[in-house]
Amino acid sequence: MDAPPNPVEPDVIERVRAAKAARRASGLVYAERPRLAFIVHSFNRVSNIDQIVDGLRAAGTHELIVCDDGSVDGSPERWLEHLDRPNDFLIHSNDLHEIRITDRAISWARSEIVCLVQDDDVIPDEPSWVQTALEHFADDPALAVIGGFMGFDSFDPDPAVAMPLWGHGEFRYVHHVNIGPYFVRRTSYEQLGGWDHTFSAPGDPGICFDSELCLRAWTNGYRVGYSFVPLKGAAGHYAMDGGTVLFTPDERERNRLANSRRIFERYADRAAEIDALVEHANTQRP
């Protein structure tokens, strides 16, 4: 019998067998329908990876999907050192930016609830912030999104115009929230059509895309909630050293202004309707 044209080396066969045996011995099993999936957008922030993994692991045995968007600082290699569980995944892309790569990751997830985390976030070392969010989703089938960074009691996406809710307090319904963390019910996301890809070209910032989905949710029978989680630091604090600020500050500002106009054009004539929906939802809270 002829030798195969592309033989697998014997040492590779042994290493594969050893790896399979180690996985079986670990006791970890693949979850077909995990309760929650964390999705991390990663872009050249290798120094924060260990801390993110430690914090997310402390939150429970959940799915972890990392979207490394073309980092050049060794981030993919560092992620691979950590992603060793059956429900861990690493998606590689080439600077598509958050809208497109997280959209693909949400469709990849097998949990009903996903939680979007950014690569500059500092994850709490106790899990109550995750459990609380999951309880809110269980209590309200119409709840599509929960944000933990800033919430807004106006449809205006600009914090300079609509003063944000930014700090501790009980859960409440709000007009819109932004990422970090950003919990979303996957079926609601899909029924709403997902992120609006017109909010950025591939590789460009997509400022306000997270807020727009919230406003779209309210006008389609869903609800949006806010409960502060200090992933960006203490209430009222944000270092403003995220990727778009560091790498493309001018494009970021142009994008913010353009997308703010988009939101006004779409929702200005429905502002009173959204106001009433938010107010009514809050009166129904236990």
Task: Kindly give the residue locations of the regions a language model identified.
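Conserved donor NDP-sugar-binding/catalytic core segment of glycosyltransferases
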Residues: 122-160
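C-terminal catalytic/acceptor-binding lobe
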Residues: 3-19, 31, 201, 205-286
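N-proximal low-complexity "stem/linker" segments adjacent to membrane-targeting elements
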Residues: 1-54
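Glycine-rich, basic loop-to-helix element that forms the pyrophosphate-binding segment
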Residues: 92-109
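A conserved acidic beta->alpha catalytic loop
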Residues: 68-77, 122
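Short, acidic, metal-binding catalytic loop of nucleotide-sugar glycosyltransferases
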Residues: 51-63
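Short beta-strand-to-loop acidic/aromatic patch adjacent to the donor-nucleotide binding site
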Residues: 112-122
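A recurrent flexible, glycine/aromatic-enriched loop bordering the glycosyltransferase active site
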Residues: 99, 152, 166-187, 206
